[in-house]
A protein has these predicted regions:
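Membrane-proximal N-terminal amphipathic helix
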Residues: 38-65
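Alpha-helix boundary/capping detector
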Residues: 1, 7, 49, 57-58, ...
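A broadly tuned, weak detector of single residues within folded domains
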Residues: 24, 43, 132-133
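Periplasmic/extracellular, small/polar-rich flexible segments of pilin-like filament-forming proteins
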Residues: 59-162
Length: 162
């Protein structure tokens, strides 16, 4: 009587498991890189939103002939202005400065700024980045000296720690 064997031998199963382990070990760094790339893309998008909000706020204030330090309302959010541009405010006042004007979510942290005075610079970071200070960009509010206005600017993104 002849026996018919079906299925895999133990050695075949071990070989398959080892091959799957090697494939997983080589694929893992690629997946980690995807997360980093996604955070860098999110940061670049936020930088674009801040730059657009800065320009929209400037155009809105210019078109209404308001004094350069008079606040405006964009999409129902009151925006504090300095020199015709949104102020850089600390996180405690997000909905009054560039953070609110750009519509940034709680996925971002904001550090610095001048809440009571004119001008100021703030750093916007991706909150869940491994090293948030290395996954950031800056916003420098306009400054006014007499009748001279130095326009606001958005710094280049730093993506090394994303």
């Amino acid at each position: 009587m002849k026996r018919v064997h079906s299925g895999f031998t133990l050695i075949e199963l071990i070989v398959v498991i080892v091959i799957l382990g090697i494939l997983a070990a080589t694929a893992l760094p690629k997946f980690m890189g995807i997360q980093s790339g996604a955070r860098a893309s999110i940061l670049t998008g936020a930088r674009g939103a801040v730059a657009s909000a800065m320009n929209i706020a400037y155009a809105t204030q210019s078109s209404t002939n308001l004094a350069s330090n008079v606040g405006i309302t964009l999409d129902g959010i009151s925006i504090a202005m300095v020199g015709g541009y949104p102020q850089a405010w600390p996180a405690a006042s997000y909905l009054s400065g560039i953070y609110g004007a750009a519509g940034l979510s709680n996925d971002y942290s904001i550090v610095g700024g001048a809440s009571a005075g004119l001008g100021g610079s703030t750093t916007i970071t991706v909150a869940n980045a491994p090293t948030p200070n290395s996954c950031a960009f800056s916003y420098t509010a306009a400054s006014v000296a007499g009748t001279t206005v130095i326009p606001a600017k958005v710094g280049a993104p730093i993506v090394g720690g994303c």
